[in-house]
Amino acid sequence: MEIRRLTYADLPQVIAIERRAFPTPWSLAMFVLELSKASGICLAAFVDDELAGYMICSRYDTVWHIMNIAVDPDRRRHGIASTLLVRLFERVDDPDAQYTLEVRRSNTSAIALYDRFRFRGAGVRRRYYADNGEDALIMWRTPGTLRGTLDDVPGT
């Protein structure tokens, strides 16, 4: 597996995966906007020279917000999302970094993945997903969650 910076040239493949992976996919304009931000980290995972997954992460003040992470449905359960997360943490390279994300409450496999990386649930965004009104679980990974506490998680 090769992990590299996501580029505009990757977007046709990104959109194809996005449409297969999510009931309410991001638009091309949303990806273009995120790629244009100098403060973000956007990663692509390639397997056999084909895009297999990607991650969009933006920095807001002192918090890294994982906005989108997706793996081609045919390539799931092969460690691609885990590798993307590891590479994000390596690139940020700050033991005091805080990360947050939203995930569908029904997406138990994604929640289990984030839990393995010491993200912890710390709130809910009611009716966050437009397609069915499902709530989003807000998860955080902070120095505190790495120690087993929520003492430095905003809002807890």
PLM feature segments, named:
Residues 121-123:
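A secondary-structure capping/hinge motif
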Residues 104-108, 117, 127-156:
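C-terminal "cap" of GNAT-fold acetyltransferases
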Residues 80, 97, 119:
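Short glycine/serine/threonine/alanine-rich loop segments
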Residues 30, 125-126:
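Short, P/G- and charge-enriched loop/turn segments at secondary-structure junctions
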Residues 2-78, 82-94, 143-146, 152-156:
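Acetyl-CoA-dependent GNAT
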Residues 92-102, 125:
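Conserved GNAT acetyl-CoA-binding A-motif
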